[in-house]
Amino acid sequence: MAVQRKYRASRRLGVSLWGRSKDPFNTRNYPPGQHGNMGYKKPSDFGKQFAAHKKFKFYYAISSKQMRNVFLKAYKKRGDTGDNFVGLLESRLSSILYNSGLVPTIFSARQLISHKHVLVNGKTVNISSYIVKVGDVVTLKEKAKNLPAVIAAIQSQEHKVPDYLEVDTQEKSVRYLRVPKYCEVPYPATMEVNLVIEFYSR
């Protein structure tokens, strides 16, 4: 039920945020609540920026404070702020594990990490925000490899694995090949990083 409550974000934002078949938005594409079936209101410019910010926040399952910190790091780095922002988010350990398709959701990725079921280059890491470096190998511990959720996720192949990850489904491991640009990330929904930059630049 906890995951179902998290999926309410899709209905609030008007998109199937994670692109999953069980997403309630697929059958009830209107906002949650008593008057939800009245549809979505046309948002203001700020409303669009705020919604874009919310999409990223929910998609990566991070707090507003964490999002702002990621933006500040991206802004200070050389290069395109949008690419830097997305690159930092995609480099998080929870994102790498989720995008590998070895787990069904970003929430299950965070749970496995916090329960110390995940190795980075052979060492246990239990921090979801840990930044994985190019060339690093993320592996599930032996006990986690046979979890029903892991086996089901691999068999379903519901999540498209991006080409900047190299996944070994036998070993239950994933190698980070390169930091992606915004345009390379196969988001299931439209993610407008330019509006997020505008939101934080107000």
Curated annotation (Swiss-Prot):
One BP term from GO: translation
Family statement drawn from the similarity comment of this UniProt entry: Belongs to the universal ribosomal protein uS4 family.
Pfam families, A to Z: Ribosomal_S4 (PF00163), S4 (PF01479)
Protein known as: Small ribosomal subunit protein uS4
Its biological purpose: One of the primary rRNA binding proteins, it binds directly to 16S rRNA where it nucleates assembly of the body of the 30S subunit. With S5 and S12 plays an important role in translational accuracy.
InterPro entries (alphabetical): Ribosomal_uS4 (IPR022801), Ribosomal_uS4_bac-type (IPR005709), Ribosomal_uS4_N (IPR001912), S4_RNA-bd (IPR002942), S4_RNA-bd_sf (IPR036986)
All residue ranges annotated as the S4 RNA-binding domain in the record: 91-168
PROSITE patterns xrefs: S4 (PS50889)
Keyword Lipoprotein: no
Gene responsible for this protein: rpsD
Record organism: Ehrlichia canis (strain Jake)
HAMAP family, alphabetized: Ribosomal_uS4_B
Keywords assigned: Ribonucleoprotein, Ribosomal protein, RNA-binding, rRNA-binding
A GO cellular component entry from the record: small ribosomal subunit
Assembly and interaction partners: Part of the 30S ribosomal subunit. Contacts protein S5. The interaction surface between S4 and S5 is involved in control of translational fidelity.
GO molecular function: rRNA binding; structural constituent of ribosome
